[in-house]
């Protein structure tokens, strides 16, 4: 990664910090939208995985992983502020001295809160509409997450952050829509490795 790329990410960090300070509501709504996108991808991924779970579980995991990449694709192409991707962007900005660590922390906090609100709203709508049809879609999935030892959960979260940030970086660096699409899908399909995405766990 050359310094021009570092500067590009650092400038993005400065722009995010400026937006939080000058138009908090706009930034917060962008974070809420990212929460919506995460929920859409998570719900779709789990429903697709459940369809294959009994007959072809290996395909269920693979297709579910591909489907989950919809979240980062939507954020990259439509727009949104995802906490996980902001970890990389704001850290670059802070190390490059384009923003302070305090400013980075503010962006992290607002984006995390916005992601939580977005996930909560869409989850309530999903349950209220009875769209899941049955709790079986998520019962086993949630139980598996809760049974993972703390140490394993931590390292899976680190892996997740790496892969999501890689997808976000590809989305920023590549110019063609086809290239961005392909690299984001390949990067974010980390869910096949049972890594854990921060916002998705909300």
Residue spans of the language-model regions?
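Membrane-interface interhelical connector segments
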Residues: 130-150
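The first (N-terminal) embedded transmembrane alpha-helix
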Residues: 29-45
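Cytosolic juxtamembrane amphipathic/interface segments immediately preceding
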Residues: 10-27, 98-99
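Transmembrane alpha-helix/helix-exit interface in multi-pass inner-membrane proteins
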Residues: 115-134
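A structural motif at transmembrane helix-loop-helix junctions in multipass membrane proteins
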Residues: 162-186
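Alpha-helical transmembrane segments of multi-pass membrane proteins
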Residues: 30, 34, 106-114, 118
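Interfacial loop-to-helix junctions that mark the boundaries of transmembrane helices
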Residues: 52-63, 151
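Conserved small/polar residues in nucleotide/adenosyl-binding loops
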Residues: 191-198
């Amino acid at each position: 990664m050359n310094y021009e790329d570092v500067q590009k990410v650092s400038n993005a960090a400065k722009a995010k910090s400026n937006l939080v300070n000058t138009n908090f509501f706009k930034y917060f709504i962008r974070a809420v939208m990212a929460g919506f996108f995460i929920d859409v991808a998570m719900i779709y991924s789990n429903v697709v995985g459940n369809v294959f779970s009994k007959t072809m579980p290996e395909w269920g995991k693979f297709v579910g992983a591909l489907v989950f990449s919809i979240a980062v694709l939507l954020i990259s192409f439509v727009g949104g502020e995802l906490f996980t991707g902001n970890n990389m962007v704001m850290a670059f900005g802070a190390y490059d001295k384009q923003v302070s660590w305090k400013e980075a922390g503010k962006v992290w906090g607002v984006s995390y809160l916005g992601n939580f609100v977005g996930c909560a709203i869409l989850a309530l709508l999903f349950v209220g509409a009875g769209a899941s049809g049955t709790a079986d879609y998520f019962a086993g999935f949630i139980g598996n997450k809760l049974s993972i030892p703390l140490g394993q959960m931590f390292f899976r979260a680190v892996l997740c952050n790496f892969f999501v940030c890689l997808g976000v970086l590809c989305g920023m660096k590549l110019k063609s829509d086809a290239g961005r699409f392909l690299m984001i899908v390949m990067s974010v399909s980390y869910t096949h490795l049972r890594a854990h995405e921060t916002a998705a766990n909300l």
